[in-house]
């Protein structure tokens, strides 16, 4: 994977038969059937008009077929999900027509359908990437009682699996959030104020501001759950993704000056944030398993939030064999796992 603007894009070379896109609200991911992947930040709510041209650029290698899954339809640049699906499908049609490729959209029932069919039933293709990912996880787990825990930048998916795929309690976002299968917390983008009401800083417990001065990313940077990346400015304040900058952002959450908060203080605050987040995910895990009445025999970990997933599993009391998807398919592919899964589905690589 490369950062946007660093040519050549790895997918623009000729030779791909299928190019799969996973279009989120904050990230754009792609994979082809040869295992090449691409992931970049793409703030859809700010750049919806740029989506079609960007997809066309990534498809410049002229694959015969483009397939797509999405979660970006919920972005608040769209009045509702149906409009979001229409906007994303229109952008995909722009890309497909620019290279005379077929276009297929992934449905929540596991089928890949035409753009016309997707537009006629937009909610059947909304928020569908988790389903494709669960099929890949099920194929790798080879168990009738596996549990998928996928922690991404924004959300966490908790899905019971059998050998055929997901055994979900619900399929749409609202139903999945009500069942506990979708937890709107992630390792990077969740505002600290949405996780805790106070932080232990500078010798006392302090209330936090109801502002997005810091995100979960800052806690996990300080704890080593995310690597430092001084070149990345995809942070709450646009500063670098470093531990020292994370310390400053956490200090700001309690309206303290950065000089008043040492590194040890900041780490203690980060532990509190991480623990609260892990408790939230652990409660959802217990709820999903209780609803199914089944105890899993193994766990599949997906996404780049493995540190949060591991802490949550410990909180939930699940000491089980674990399959890390990044070890099974490689770290780059794991970061774009729904797109990788969809490319495999489209070519018959997984059932």
Give, region by region, the residue ranges found by the protein language model.
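Conserved Rossmann-like nucleotide-cofactor binding loop
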Residues: 26, 154
């Amino acid at each position: 994977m490369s950062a946007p603007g660093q040519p050549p894009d790895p997918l623009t070379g000729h030779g791909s038969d299928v190019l799969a896109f996973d279009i989120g609200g904050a990230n754009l991911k792609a994979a082809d059937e040869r295992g090449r992947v691409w992931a970049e930040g793409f703030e859809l709510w700010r750049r919806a008009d740029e989506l079609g041209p960007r997809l066309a650029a990534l498809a410049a290698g002229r694959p015969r077929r483009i397939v797509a899954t999405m979660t970006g339809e919920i972005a608040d640049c769209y009045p509702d999900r149906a409009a979001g699906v229409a906007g994303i499908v229109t952008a995909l049609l722009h890309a497909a027509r620019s290279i005379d490729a077929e276009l297929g959209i992934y449905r929540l029932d596991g089928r890949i359908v035409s753009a016309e069919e997707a537009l006629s039933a937009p909610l059947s293709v909304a928020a569908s990437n988790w389903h494709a990912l669960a099929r890949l996880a099920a194929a790798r787990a080879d168990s009738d009682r596996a549990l998928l825990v996928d922690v991404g930048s924004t959300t966490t998916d908790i899905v019971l699996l059998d050998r055929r795929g997901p055994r979900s309690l619900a399929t749409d976002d609202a139903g999945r959030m009500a069942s506990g299968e979708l937890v709107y917390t992630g390792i990077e983008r969740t505002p600290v104020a949405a996780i805790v009401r106070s932080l232990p800083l500078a010798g006392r417990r302090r209330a936090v501001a109801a502002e997005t001065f810091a995100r979960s990313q800052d806690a996990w940077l300080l704890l080593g759950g995310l690597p430092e990346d001084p070149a990345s400015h995809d942070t709450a304040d646009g500063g670098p993704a470093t531990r020292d900058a994370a310390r400053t952002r956490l200090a700001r959450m309690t309206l303290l000056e950065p000089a008043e908060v040492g590194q040890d203080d900041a780490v203690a605050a980060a532990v509190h944030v991480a623990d609260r987040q892990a408790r939230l995910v652990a409660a959802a895990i217990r709820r999903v398993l209780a609803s199914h009445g089944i105890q899993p025999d193994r766990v599949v970990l997906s996404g780049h939030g493995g540190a949060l997933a591991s802490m949550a599993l410990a909180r939930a009391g699940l000491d089980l064999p674990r399959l890390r998807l990044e070890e099974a398919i490689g770290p780059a592919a794991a970061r774009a796992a729904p797109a990788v899964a969809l490319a495999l589905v489209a070519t018959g690589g997984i059932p």
